[in-house]
Amino acid sequence: MENFWSLCLGRFEEELSAQQFNTWIKPLRFEAREGTLRLLAPNRFVQQWVKDRFLQKISALAEEVLSTPVQIELALYDASEKSPITLAKPKPAEAPGAAAKIEAEISKVTKTVSPAKPASAAPKKPKTLTETSGLNPAFRFDNFVTGKANQLARAAAIQVAENPGTAYNPLFIYGGVGLGKTHVLQAIGNHLKSQRPDAKIRYLHAERYVSDVVKAYEHKAFDEFKRQYHSLDLLLIDDIQFFAKKSRTQEEFFYAFNSLIEAKKQIIITCDTYPKEIADVDERLRTRFSWGLTVAVEPPELEMRVAILLKKAEAARVTLDEDVAFFIAKQVRSSVRELEGALNRIIAMANFTGHAIDVSLAKEALKDLIAVRGRQITIENIQKTVADYYKIKVAEMYSKKRSRNFARPRQIAMTLARELTNHSFPEIGEAFGGRHHTTVMHACDEIEQLRQNDQNVARDIAVLIQVIRD
């Protein structure tokens, strides 16, 4: 059962800033008793904070892995290790034997799929920034699945990893949540570390950098702060958009950026949007973000999603037929993280029920996801979202006007309808003013070409996909 908590720790460590993770999640203790998972907090403040903000996520993760509701109890332990004080009321106990089954299935799945980052043992003495790289060795180029959605980002990353400070400096990678930006970022660091073990490498989330600036300010230790950050060979900053409205942080990063670039040291940045569109960040920083190379990471296309699933199944030593992989890939389209979660659920259900993994079992395991997806995304919703985005009337989606101002958004909407729904080309054509299915096919081909060659179109589509799915 400890493996389940390791999975939770790994997921939260990936999604939260280091400060949030160390303050709220890492102090929790975990135990399992009679079909109930128990989390023990060190004090009432942490207990209430976790209950309000993270308990639902932990419960959802348990249900995602097991495809069955699991009781999560949040309690309080005192310093003398007495019986915990319960905050959350327990749900009805699982059926006899359920605890053993749950423990067995969590153990099997979490050992093979989505390995969590191991929790670090408390160091005997504090380490300086340059002694702690922050890298996760699990993120490497050899286990990163490449497709049209990320091939440019991967190629640029490899070039930078092999020639740091000379090619594409800075390298700016942008895209939505769960698309592999962090994987690419850390793969660069791990590659350089393997080639140059003595290199000073630092990976961190932008919020951690903000925290370091605050600490330096509080302790009047900016000389030490600058010495550590300005002496790096490779600086990897994740989610730079978190610098928004933090003027002192932006000022310090401006100095660090200039110092590293002048010394021909490599900087790599990830963000959820294009450099010029980052809100509430100083213009001089946004300009510098574009000095090197800017590349997008987009949602994976169907073939890439299938390849990701097959690779993860292989790593988990699970047999996954291509027809099952295609079925999963057609249902889960937004991110690699969601693909991973869907596969976890299917494997757990197969182990739990004793059935072989086939399309019918996959449908059962993902029935809630399929139902939600079916309710949320419709052609009408896509048409309205695209029309709003391009500031045209929805009626232009059905009209015969061929002006580029109307035709381009219409073609993009057709393409998104094909990607985000299960409708056929003829059905999509009918929804767009009774157009022939070949018109829809031509629109999809044309937009796909533009997507590969026009950065603005690629960015528009990535934004639209996120808006539609949210």
Swiss-Prot record:
Region of interest (Domain IV, binds dsDNA), residue spans: 351-470
Places the protein is found: Cytoplasm
Domain I, interacts with DnaA modulators: annotated span: 1-68
Region (Domain III, AAA+ region): 134-350
Gene Ontology CC: one annotated term: plasma membrane
Gene Ontology process terms (BP): DNA replication initiation; regulation of DNA replication
Record region (Domain II): 68-133
Ranges in coiled-coil conformation: none
Molecular-function GO terms, alphabetical: ATP binding; ATP hydrolysis activity; DNA replication origin binding; lipid binding
The keyword DNA-binding is assigned to this record: yes
UniProt keyword terms in alphabetical order: ATP-binding, Cytoplasm, DNA replication, DNA-binding, Lipid-binding, Nucleotide-binding
InterPro entries reported in the protein's UniProt record: AAA+_ATPase, Chromosome_initiator_DnaA, Chromosome_initiator_DnaA-like, Chromosome_initiator_DnaA_CS, DnaA_C, DnaA_dom, DnaA_N_dom, DnaA_N_sf
Protein's UniProt keywords contain Nucleotide-binding: yes
Binding positions for ATP per the UniProt entry: G178, G180, K181, T182
Pfam families: Bac_DnaA, Bac_DnaA_C, DnaA_N
Subunit structure: Oligomerizes as a right-handed, spiral filament on DNA at oriC.
Function: Plays an essential role in the initiation and regulation of chromosomal replication. ATP-DnaA binds to the origin of replication (oriC) to initiate formation of the DNA replication initiation complex once per cell cycle. Binds the DnaA box (a 9 base pair repeat at the origin) and separates the double-stranded (ds)DNA. Forms a right-handed helical filament on oriC DNA; dsDNA binds to the exterior of the filament while single-stranded (ss)DNA is stabiized in the filament's interior.
Record note on domains: Domain I is involved in oligomerization and binding regulators, domain II is flexibile and of varying length in different bacteria, domain III forms the AAA+ region, while domain IV binds dsDNA.
HAMAP family: DnaA_bact
Name listed for the protein in its UniProt record: Chromosomal replication initiator protein DnaA
Organism: Methylobacillus flagellatus (strain ATCC 51484 / DSM 6875 / VKM B-1610 / KT)
Upper lineage: Bacteria, Pseudomonadati, Pseudomonadota, Betaproteobacteria, Nitrosomonadales
